[in-house]
Design a protein with these regions (language model features):
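An N-terminal, well-structured beta->alpha segment
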Residues: 7, 11-113, 203-232, 243
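Gly/Ser/Thr-enriched, mixed-charge loops and adjacent short helices
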Residues: 17, 21, 25, 41-45, ...
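Conserved phosphate/anionic-ligand binding catalytic regions in large, soluble enzymes, centered on
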Residues: 46-66, 153-156, 235, 239-251, ...
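N-terminal small/polar loop signature for handling phosphorylated ligands or for N-terminal nucleophile
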Residues: 97-160, 258-314
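Active-site phosphate-binding/coordination module
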Residues: 135-191, 307, 405
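Glycine-rich phosphate-binding loop plus the immediately following alpha-helix
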Residues: 166-194, 329-353, 357-367, 420, ...
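Phosphate-binding and adjacent anionic-ligand microenvironments
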Residues: 295, 299-301, 322-324, 342-470
């Protein structure tokens, strides 16, 4: 009986999607679901509205209120535009950055969002093609925008897409703006969405921002001399078909690394991710092609970025010469250990310097910070909280690095989200520093364990998609 009531509710909701407010393709898809005797798909697509949460939208693509499509994306953008026009009504021309990753429909959603923002009188800086999430964050700050969005579902399977919303500091939206935007989005009906854009308010950006961003990333190198000595460090990199495919190799080259090998099959931009089960750099399977290449050429390090190039996975050889994955906690530990030790060694460390980690990230980082008399701040899970700590201390202290166990790291304050572009370059420098001492990254990790203690951890993912699996 309960199931019959649910079918009745979703049928009534779906029938509203057969009106002229929706395009013919969408109407045909909804009609097909309504006529199908098996109502499972209809239920999944309409049993709720895709929720615009504090991080934006994320969901499976398709027709329906519980799917990522031009109408759910349109409502999110219209709601954000309404809030921006309220919040900054006395600030002159409001502007936003719009970016996207390699996923199917990401460009379409980005262009539709640009049209909606411009139709609401908001100037749009639209990236010409896919770009890393951290570059979107950088562009918001660099161009003095009030907000920005990136169309991406990070490392989720190919069926998904998503919508990340950012505020004027380049960080994901926090209170009080997050709940206020949600309220605005929830008020929007399909008739409210202004799909007809104002092309005069849309400006295409690309290489101009790339150049400034890469110059800033290059300035993060702590020990350029060690790179000069180890410029032939053998690096294997894969973007997993995503947004890191141009800027990460370019950054490595700019830092001085001359022996970078990209996995050719995975340098191809594709939202279908044809060479992997899931484009998640945490998974061994996603790095398998890169590791095979590394074995052939006897590489020193393997790195993989996810589709929007904000997270990085890494592998290196252990003490037996076998390739092993370095998990997020270990990578974050290596990352911050190197920054601290070498800033001290090069005389760059200042009393006001601080690092940040999330509460679920290894406590060995605190041990390193304490022994070296560096302030370490714990924050809630999620990189927006690391960004919050940076913002709270602006003008008083200097952020020098942070990260989380979920493979997100940030060495700079000119970006306010995790950054695989700078992380890959700095991790390569760490590998060069190790090799300069006749060591591997694995050896450095063992040295840290000897000096600061040992810890071991594992992550268990539980996936329960849809109404009927709850």
């Amino acid at each position: 009986m309960e199931n019959q009531e649910l079918i009745k509710q979703v049928t009534e909701k779906a029938e509203k999607w057969l009106t002229p407010a929706y395009d013919a393709e969408t109407q045909a898809e909804v009609k097909r679901m309504l006529e199908n005797p098996d109502k499972t798909e209809l239920i999944e697509c309409f049993y709720k509205d895709l929720e615009f949460g504090t991080g934006g939208l994320r969901g499976i693509m398709g027709a329906g209120s519980n799917r990522m499509n031009i109408y759910t994306v349109g409502a999110a953008t219209q709601g954000l535009a309404n809030y921006l026009n309220k919040c900054f009504k006395d600030k002159g021309q409001i502007s936003v950055v719009v970016g996207h990753d390699c996923r199917n429909n990401s460009r379409k959603f980005a262009e539709i969002s640009a049209d909606i923002f411009s139709a609401n009188g908001i100037k749009v800086y639209l990236f010409e093609d896919l770009r890393p999430t951290p570059e979107v964050s950088f562009a918001i700050r660099h161009l003095g925008c009030q907000s920005g969005i990136n169309l991406t579902a990070s490392h989720n399977p190919k069926e998904y897409n998503g919508y990340k919303a950012y505020w004027d500091d380049g960080a994901q939206v926090l209170a009080p703006h997050d709940t206020a935007i949600i309220d605005e989005v929830n008020k929007v009906t399909v008739e409210d969405i202004k799909f007809k854009g104002n092309k005069d308010l849309i400006q295409i950006i690309g290489e101009d921002i790339d150049e400034v961003y890469l110059d800033k990333v290059h300035a993060l190198s702590i020990d350029p001399e060690v790179i000069k000595r180890q410029k032939d460090l053998s690096i294997v990199y894969t973007p997993l078909h995503g947004a890191g495919r141009v800027l990460i190799p370019a950054s490595l080259k700019e830092w001085g690394f001359e022996n970078v090998h990209c996995v050719p099959e995975q340098m191809v931009k594709s939202g279908d991710f044809p060479t992997v089960v899931s484009p998640n750099p945490e998974n061994a399977e996603a790095l398998s092609m890169a590791i095979e290449l590394a074995k052939k050429i006897d590489a020193d390090i393997v790195m993989a970025s996810d589709p929007d190039a904000d997270r990085v996975g890494m592998a290196c050889k252990d003490d037996k010469g076998e390739w092993v994955l370095i998990n997020g906690n270990q990578t974050c530990l290596l990352f911050l250990y190197y920054i601290i030790k070498n800033r001290i060694a090069t005389g760059k460390m200042q009393p006001t310097d601080f690092i940040v980690k999330t509460i679920v990230t290894t406590e060995l980082i605190k041990a390193v910070a304490d022994k070296n008399k560096i302030e370490m701040i714990d924050c809630y899970t999620g990189f927006k909280w690391i960004a919050r700590e940076i913002r709270l201390r602006e003008g008083k202290q200097q952020y020098i690095g942070g990260g989380e166990e979920s493979y997100g790291f940030l060495a700079e304050d000119f970006v306010r989200d995790k950054d695989a572009v700078s992380a890959c370059s700095l991790l390569a420098e760490i590998c060069a520093w190790a090799k300069d001492q006749g060591k591997t990254l694995y050896d450095i990790l063992m040295d840290i364990y000897v000096e600061y203690g040992f810890s071991k951890e594992t992550t268990v993912n539980v996936v329960k998609p849809g109404k009927l699996s709850l």
